[in-house]
């Protein structure tokens, strides 16, 4: 099974305008809202390719039903550690005349040390089902930059292949785990 990790799930709200004018009122021609996060997106594609997959990570309790309901609708099993707050919102403004997308992404609700510890503990059980682990995306405030390295090391002890898609300090620390 391919287990995907999403530590900072979100709602993408994509607004299409004919021509975006900064500092002015712009009228939306189309609005689309999607539940996502890099790991969730990977699992959705894998499911479409008829691959066995599972989502693992954090789930803000205010939007737990929305997130788990979305995954259940796609028949993707999930194992989440509940955190405070709601899904972060990423605003995407698409200027149709220029074919340009402008993004404004929230950081996410801070996660407690206890939630991080619980995630690392639950990883032991979740990894029993995994042959591949995909670590991808941003992390909310409160999650240490070495989280991907720590999870990679746990996975390696079980012979799980790890794919890392990260940037900045998450990538620098993550590659120390030798994914």
Task: For every predicted segment, state its role.
Residues 1-56, 64-66:
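Glycine-rich phosphate/adenosyl-contacting loop at the front of the ribokinase-like
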Residues 5-9, 58-61, 83, 96, ...:
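Cofactor-binding loop segments of dinucleotide-utilizing enzymes, especially the Rossmann-like FAD-
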Residues 19-22, 71-74, 149-151:
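Short, solvent-exposed amphipathic alpha-helical segments in soluble enzyme
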Residues 24, 48-130:
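Conserved N-terminal subdomain of the carbohydrate kinase-like
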Residues 132-179:
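Conserved beta-alpha-beta core of the PfkB/ribokinase-like small-molecule kinase fold
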């Amino acid at each position: 099974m391919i287990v995907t990790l999403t530590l900072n799930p979100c709602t993408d709200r994509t607004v299409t305008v004919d021509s975006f004018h900064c500092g002015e009122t712009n009228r939306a021609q189309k609005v689309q809202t999607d539940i996502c996060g890099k790991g969730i997106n990977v699992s959705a594609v894998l499911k479409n390719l008829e691959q066995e997959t599972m989502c693992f990570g954090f789930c803000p309790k205010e939007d737990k039903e929305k997130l788990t309901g979305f995954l259940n609708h796609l028949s993707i099993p999930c194992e989440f550690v509940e955190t405070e707050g709601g899904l972060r919102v990423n605003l995407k403004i698409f200027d149709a005349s220029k074919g340009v997308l402008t993004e404004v992404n929230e950081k996410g609700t801070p996660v407690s040390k206890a939630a991080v510890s619980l995630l690392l503990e639950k990883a032991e059980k979740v990894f029993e089902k995994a042959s591949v682990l995909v670590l991808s995306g941003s992390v909310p405030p409160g999650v240490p930059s070495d989280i991907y390295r720590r999870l990679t090391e746990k996975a390696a002890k079980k012979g799980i292949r790890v794919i890392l898609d990260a940037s900045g300090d998450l990538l620098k620390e993550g590659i120390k785990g030798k994914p």
